Swiss-Prot record:
Record membrane topology: Multi-pass membrane protein
Lineage of source species: Eukaryota, Metazoa, Chordata, Craniata, Vertebrata
Subcellular localization(s) per the UniProt record: Endoplasmic reticulum membrane
Example GO BP: protein mannosylation
Record protein name field: Dolichol kinase
Record region (CTP-binding): 459-474
Lumenal side stretches: 1-18, 96-111, 156-163, 210-224, 276-297, 355-359, 423-436, 494-495
Molecular function terms from GO: dolichol kinase activity
Gene for this chain: DOLK
Record bears the keyword Lipid metabolism: yes
Catalytic activity: a di-trans,poly-cis-dolichol + CTP = a di-trans,poly-cis-dolichyl phosphate + CDP + H(+)
Length: 538
């Protein structure tokens, strides 16, 4: 979450506005840093992709200003194509490097497939923008065509036939998800956010299908499949109910009972058998044994339940204040919204230090609960639908302009993705050394500490504003300082972290991501942890 009151709309300035150029400059610093660290043909592809995305981004911005985009996108931000386009490719590159260093060829190839899939979906988004822009932007088409040609040529000679098919399958899923979800969820995403979120879901769905078809008789590691099945199951459930409630009123008791019954049927009849096929054991029994395997896990679960209770009490207290307020449009102040960031930090740090597998599973379960409650709120499912609408409306901001409220889900994703995306098979011989030891803390540092401190200090004491934004220099500087202090505390309390004198890279990574937070208009809860993860893992 950001600290500005109301970010400028795309139409409030020229396409080549200073804030957009500054955001692009920060992104190119990240891309070139990873290119210098990796320096192979795949990193050259990432540079080419960033160059063409930089030019195509302005076509998307113009389409949004003119209202000529195919779907209804969120209007309180620019398109965000450039920062979103390079995330999956860069993530794949750094995963490849880490697994190559660990001597794991399977996951080294997996990283290349991640990078290739990210480039494919990014090129599709660029082609879509160029295809609907009138008049046809000849120069931009030439640049995009040259970059795309280089990427396709290199990938053609680097990927096996099976890997090419895998990338094309993920691209096909991405195209269909774009048509379905962007139609069902108008104004929920910018083009860049749609690329990032739907690209990730498409890749996960394709991986789940692949692993379901190639599962062997031996038991699989449940942690490798639990997240895939839960995320894909919740997305498919949402598509199913969205289609169903087109033909019936979702707010009646009959529809609500049907919703709960079908949720049980889909969960017990589809999701659990699917997970059972993958892990070759009873999923519920495995989950119960996993959660209560050690005494430490029991204490952690009790502690997390206490924090969840505190979060619920904060929501109820703020709504009680609104009820007694004279203004019916009372909104929670910035500091109040940041309470949840503090609660999440207090949740994740003990989990990262004491039991990361438990945190991995608990975050997955929490994500499923958040998505399910959002379905209940969105479809007005009785008995909680209207209550959730009233309670959560207090915490809305300009980014919740669509039918879904996604900021709390993005916060959970931003904190959890560094846990989920750490290449565990490539770190089994020992923890990551140097700056890479901080990878699991990327969400805590970027969002839990950095964004929270920047928002509070920027909104209360900030006076010097960054050009073209409502973000402040004081907020950014205090954000960097707070993250440095947090790194020092992590060194004290987590004995498994050994930075190996990589302090300059850590400081540069934190500063770069803090500058990105100052200029981006995208969902920073999701974007910032991914960029910090990429830089720390490089």
């Amino acid at each position: 979450m950001t600290r500005e009151c109301a970010p400028p709309t795309p139409g409030s300035g020229a396409p080549l506005s200073g804030s957009v150029l500054a955001e692009a400059a920060v992104v190119f610093v990240v891309v070139l840093s990873i290119h210098a660290a990796v320096w192979d043909r795949y990193s050259w592809c990432a540079v080419a992709l960033a160059v063409q995305a930089f030019y195509v981004q302005y076509k998307w911005d113009r389409l949004l200003q003119q209202g000529s985009a195919v779907f209804q996108f969120r209007m309180s931000a620019n398109s965000g194509l450039l920062p979103a386009s390079v995330v999956m490719p860069l993530l794949g590159l750094v995963m490849k490097e880490r697994c190559q260093a660990a001597g794991n060829p399977y996951f080294e190839r997996f990283g290349i497939v991640v990078a290739a899939t990210g480039m494919a979906v990014a090129l599709f988004s660029s082609v879509l923008a160029l295809g609907i822009t009138r008049p046809v932007p000849t120069n931009t088409c030439v640049i995009s065509g040259l970059a795309g040609g280089v990427i396709i040529y290199i990938m053609k000679h680097s990927l096996s036939v099976g890997e090419v098919i895998e990338v094309l399958e993920a691209l096909l899923i991405f195209v269909y998800l774009n048509m379905i979800l962007l139609y069902l969820l108008p104004r929920c995403f910018t083009p860049g956010e749609a690329l990032l979120v739907l690209g990730g879901i498409s890749f996960m769905l394709n991986q789940l299908i692949k692993r379901s078809l190639t599962v062997v008789e031996s038991q699989g590691d449940p942690l490798d499949f639990f997240l895939l099945v839960v995320v894909v199951g919740m997305v498919l459930m949402g598509i199913f109910f969205s289609t169903l409630f087109v033909f019936m009123d979702s707010g009646t008791w009959a529809s609500s009972i049907f919703f709960h019954l079908m949720t049980c049927v889909l969960g017990l009849g589809v999701v659990l058998p699917w997970l059972h096929r993958l892990i070759r054991r009873n999923p519920l029994l495995w989950l119960f044994q996993f959660l209560f395997q050690t005494e430490t896990r029991v204490y952690l679960l009790a502690y997390w339940c206490l924090l969840a209770t505190v979060a619920c009490l904060v929501v109820l207290y703020q709504n009680a204040k609104r009820s007694s307020s004279e203004s019916k449009k009372h909104q929670a102040p910035t500091i109040t919204r940041k309470y949840f960031h503090f609660i999440v930090v207090a949740t994740y740090i003990p989990g990262i230090i004491l039991d990361r597998p438990l945190l991995y599973v608990a975050a997955t379960v929490c994500l499923a609960v958040f998505i399910f409650l959002e379905y209940v709120r969105y479809f007005r499912i009785k008995p909680l639908g209207h209550t959730l609408r009233s309670l959560l409306s207090l915490f809305l901001d300009e980014r919740d302009s669509g039918p879904l409220i996604l900021t709390h889900i993005y916060l959970l994703l931003g904190m959890s993705l560094p846990i989920w995306l750490v290449p565990r098979p490539c770190t089994q011989k020992g923890s990551l050394g140097g700056a890479r030891a901080l990878v699991p803390y990327a969400g805590v540092l970027a969002v839990g500490v950095g964004d929270t401190v920047a928002s509070i200090f920027g909104s209360t004491m900030g006076e010097i504003r960054w050009p073209g934004t409502k973000k402040t220099f004081e907020g950014t500087m205090t954000s960097i300082f707070a993250q440095i202090i947090s790194v020092a505390l992590i060194l004290i309390f987590d004995s498994g972290v050994d930075l190996n004198y990589s302090y300059a890279w850590i400081l540069g990574s934190i500063s770069t991501v803090s500058l990105l937070e100052a200029y981006t208009t995208q969902i920073d809860n999701l974007l910032l942890p991914l960029y910090l993860l990429i830089l720390l893992m490089a």
